[in-house]
Every structure is written in C-alpha cells, then in structure tokens.
C-alpha cells in the first residue's frame, strides 16, 4: 500500500513538473512572438469609428521592412507622428504622387482610384498640410470619422514610410466585437 502511495506521489510530481515546463515554454514563446511579430493598441477615441471604437483593443501586425508598394490606400496602420511624439492608428488616404489642392479655404486630396478615375476627398481646413504633391515615401493618414476632434495628417502633417510600424488587425477586446468590423 505504501509503495502505491509513493508511486502516485511521484507521478503527480512528475505531471506537475511537466505541466509547469509546458506553461513556462508557452509563456516564453508567446512573449517572443508578441515582441517580434505583434503588438496591441488601445483606442482611446472614436476617431476610427465605425471599425474601431473607443475602448477597443486590437492586434497590430508589425512590419519588418516596408516598401512603398506594400502600403495601399485604405490600409489601417499604426504610425509614429514625429511632430506630436505620439503613435496613432489611422487609415491611409494619400499616397506618394497624390495632390493636395486648396480651394475656398478648404483642402482637398486629389488622387486616382484603383480604376484610374480621378477622385477628390475634402479635408476641411487641415492646418498641418500645404498645397502640393505628396513626395516619395510620404503618406496622408486620416481618421475614419472626419468629424471627430482627433489628430491625423490634417493637424500633424504627413507620415513617412519609416514611421509606419504595423497594420491594424483583429479586435481583441471587447470579446463581443472580436470577429466583427462594423
């Protein structure tokens, strides 16, 4: 009877050791993956509404080395605005070669869509932008909700390719919105 009890204790200790080893390995692996490939972002405003809302936490897929051809109009990216020493998630609207025009004290982004049709997007006053063509490796990033009082390229200026660090992905929190982007 004592032998069975001793064997049972040894099995439990061994199982506990294996469980702890697996738990530690999984934790270290998750930390490394997060450090290298992903990060999270907390949305503190409704500027990206309706897709991302205030209080959402989303996964950002980090870029290793980004080229101008990998950024597309409509991408939602995490970037560093040097002028404000801040990191924001915003949508790419203006691409290198697009034109910023001024008419009636309003600024407009003039660009060709995917079908080659000329389009324009009104941006209001936009004190951070000046008339002209967007230079190579420069992008115009805007909030989805242009009525929101939020910082973007209209107030902070253009973002350069080297300042774009990640692409927005799935919502982690709240769980009810995890697989929805509406």
Model-derived regions: residue spans:
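Hydrophobic membrane-insertion alpha-helices, especially the h-region
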Residues: 17-36
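Soluble "head" domains of membrane/secretory-pathway proteins
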Residues: 2-16, 41-42, 49-182
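N-terminal active-site beta-alpha-beta segment that forms phosphate/nucleotide-binding
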Residues: 35-38, 42-43
């Amino acid at each position: 009877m004592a032998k069975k009890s001793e064997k049972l204790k040894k099995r439990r200790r061994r199982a506990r050791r294996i469980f702890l080893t697996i738990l530690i390995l999984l934790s270290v692996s998750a930390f490394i993956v997060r450090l290298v490939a992903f990060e999270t972002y907390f949305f503190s405003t409704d500027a990206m509404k309706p897709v991302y809302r205030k209080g959402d936490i989303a996964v950002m897929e980090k870029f290793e080395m980004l080229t101008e051809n990998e950024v597309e109009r409509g991408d939602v990216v995490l970037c560093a605005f040097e002028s404000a020493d801040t990191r924001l998630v915003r949508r790419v609207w203006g691409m290198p070669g697009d034109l910023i025009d001024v008419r009636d004290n309003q600024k407009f982004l003039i660009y060709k869509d995917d079908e080659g049709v000329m389009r324009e997007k009104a941006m209001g006053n936009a004190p951070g932008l000046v008339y002209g063509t967007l230079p190579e490796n420069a992008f115009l990033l805007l909030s989805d909700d242009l009525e929101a009082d939020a910082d973007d390229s209209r107030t902070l200026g253009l973002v350069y390719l080297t300042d774009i660090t990640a692409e927005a992905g799935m919502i982690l929190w709240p769980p009810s919105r995890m697989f929805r982007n509406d």
